[in-house]
UniProtKB/Swiss-Prot annotation:
Principal EC category: oxidoreductase
Catalytic reaction annotation: Fe(II)-heme o + 2 A + H2O = Fe(II)-heme a + 2 AH2
Localization per Swiss-Prot or TrEMBL: Cell membrane
Annotated TM spans: 21-41, 85-102, 136-156, 173-193, 208-228, 264-284, 299-319, 322-342
Signal peptide annotation: none
Molecular function via GO: metal ion binding; oxidoreductase activity, acting on NAD(P)H, heme protein as acceptor
Function (record text): Catalyzes the conversion of heme O to heme A by two successive hydroxylations of the methyl group at C8. The first hydroxylation forms heme I, the second hydroxylation results in an unstable dihydroxymethyl group, which spontaneously dehydrates, resulting in the formyl group of heme A.
Its EC number(s): 1.17.99.9
Keyword check for Membrane: yes
Protein name (database record): Heme A synthase
Binding locations of heme: 270, 327
Length: 355
């Protein structure tokens, strides 16, 4: 055997390693939850517009000297947020908000590298089981799309607005949560394959799609609450400023505009749709328990209860930053736990897939 053939992908190939792939995806899922948390801090500290350019490579390093800091600060001074809200901000104040946006972007890159590098390695070693290559590629590509959506979101606040579009913020957050769910689902499939080489991948049931739809609405409303700062319109619970249906809803532009843009109405809907989401998830937990998956059922009940309590605490605290961040982090954990629960109840039938 020649040296060149010894180094070829075919000769270095190993048997598929679904267990190792599953552990890798679980680690990346944890990273995604961390990024979601830092994203919440970035939003709540109003740091998201502090970096006015998208430099995927050169932007890795922060300003390294005073001249670089002044240059970055001058760029920030050109956007409406500085002129209308932060006029007079000191360089020290700018450095504080710059840090969180920079960290959020760096962690996003870390997630990207944590997917791309192992994926290329496992693909080169031919260690990816048949039927999973396309799925792992899609998850890896989704990180790149998420980065582009993040910049698209930031760009919405650089010219005419003092904040980002709540529609784009929702797209950014929901894409991250979709990625998280995909990582968990695929990790569970690979874990099952590691235990049983003949295990087929799980498929969503009709009931599962219904649960996802209900949860999706709640997550969308939560993202809009965040993007519109709607959490601040009421700090009382269960009533909103002594009313069940809050005063202050602007219906002048029509019902659809109010439904998608009015902070009072969106806060109200997020507050009460949470009970529909909780009910659907508790029914899911009941089904899990009846089918012997008591650990998954207990985990789901605990996370649902924690998220409901954190939501109420966020309201009555007047959107205390760390409480609100925990609400966002536990929301991400809830997505992961729900994905795992739905996978446990998924349909399984032997099918032929292509890698």
């Amino acid at each position: 055997m020649t040296n060149s053939s010894a180094l070829s992908p075919s000769s270095s190939a190993v048997a598929p390693r679904p267990g190792a792939l599953a552990r890798w995806l679980w680690a990346v899922a944890l990273l995604v939850i961390i990024v979601v948390g830092v994203g919440g801090i970035t939003r709540l500290t109003e740091s998201g517009l502090s970096i006015t350019e998208w430099r995927p490579v050169s932007g890795v390093l922060p300003p390294l000297n005073e001249a670089d800091w002044v240059r970055e600060f001058e760029k920030y001074k050109q956007i409406p947020e500085y002129k209308e809200i932060n006029l007079g901000m000191t360089l020290a104040g700018f450095k504080a908000i710059f840090f969180w946006e920079w960290l959020h972007r760096i962690l996003g890159r870390v997630v990207g590298m944590a997917l791309v590098v192992p994926f290329v390695w496992y693909a080169w070693r031919r260690a990816i089981p048949a039927g999973y290559g396309w799925r792992l590629f899609a998850l890896t590509a989704l990180v790149g799309l998420q980065g582009a959506i993040g910049w698209w979101m930031v760009a919405s606040g650089l010219e005419y607005r003092t904040d980002v579009s709540h529609y784009r913020l929702a797209a950014h957050l929901l894409t991250a949560l979709f990625l998280l769910a995909g990582l968990v689902w695929t990790a569970r499939d690979l874990g099952a394959l590691a235990r049983d080489p003949g295990a087929p991948p799980a498929r969503l049931t009709g009931a599962a799609i219904g649960v996802i739809a209900i949860l999706f609405v709640q997550l969308l409303l939560g993202a809009w609450v965040a993007g519109l700062n709607a959490g601040y319109v009421s700090s009382s619970w269960p009533l909103m400023n002594d009313h069940f249906v809050p005063e202050g809803i602007d219906w002048s532009g029509g019902a659809w505009l109010a439904l998608t843009n009015d902070p009072f109405l969106i806060h109200f809907l997020h507050r009460w749709w949470s009970w529909a989401a909780a009910g659907a998830l508790l029914l899911l937990a009941r089904t899990l328990a009846r089918r012997g998956a008591r650990a998954e059922a207990c985990a789901l009940v605990i996370v649902v209860a924690a998220q409901m309590l954190l939501g109420i605490w966020t309201i009555v605290s007047g959107v205390s930053m760390w409480v609100a961040v925990m609400h966002q982090v536990v929301g991400a954990i809830l997505v992961a736990v729900t994905a795992a629960a739905l996978h446990r109840l998924g349909r399984r039938s032997a099918i032929t897939e292509v890698s």
